[in-house]
């Protein structure tokens, strides 16, 4: 498996969902992969909202604090979830924006405002 930080972006081969799957794999959890539509079709109809429950995630309540390993769905310049990342215990997220290297960023105001769903895998319930 490639290192989680510093990956080149490539649709399906090395994108945000691939990074999330590899993060969980490093924790001993295998998440499903889906046949993703061509990139331009995904931009018009992202599949994240259709898939998170099938992958074993549940949505956190508003009063539940984030914990390391929680998944975050983002609406990045869109009204639909088109990006996913992982919350890390130091207040950062691990994610992979299109045409950029995978990285950790502060889970600051802009990313918090862009968050559409806060998810926890059923295997990581407290």
Give short role names for the model-derived ranges.
Residues 1-7:
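Active-site-adjacent structural segments surrounding the nucleophilic cysteine of cysteine proteases
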Residues 5, 30, 103:
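Glycine-rich, flexible loop/turn motifs
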Residues 8-27:
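Active-site nucleophilic cysteine motif
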Residues 11-13, 31-36:
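Surface-exposed patches in mature extracellular/periplasmic domains of secreted proteins
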Residues 28-29, 91:
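Detector for glycine-centered tight turns/loop "hinges" at secondary-structure junctions
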Residues 29-33, 42-43:
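Short acidic/glycine-rich loop or secondary-structure boundary segments that cap or lie
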Residues 37-101, 107:
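...with weaker cross-activation on analogous glycine-rich loops/strands in unrelated enzymes
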Residues 102-126:
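Short, Lys/Arg-rich amphipathic alpha-helical interaction segments
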């Amino acid at each position: 498996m490639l290192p989680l930080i510093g990956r080149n972006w490539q649709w399906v081969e090395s994108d945000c969902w691939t990074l999330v799957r590899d993060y969980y794999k490093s924790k001993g959890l295998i998440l499903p992969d889906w046949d993703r539509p061509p990139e331009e079709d995904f931009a018009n109809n992202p599949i994240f909202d259709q898939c998170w429950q099938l992958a074993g995630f549940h949505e956190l309540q508003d009063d539940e604090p984030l914990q390391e390993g929680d998944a975050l769905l983002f609406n990045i310049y869109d009204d639909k979830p088109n990006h996913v990342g992982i919350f890390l215990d130091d207040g950062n997220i691990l994610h992979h924006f299109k045409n950029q290297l995978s990285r950790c960023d502060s889970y600051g105001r802009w990313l918090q405002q862009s968050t559409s769903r806060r998810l926890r895998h059923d295997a990581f319930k407290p």
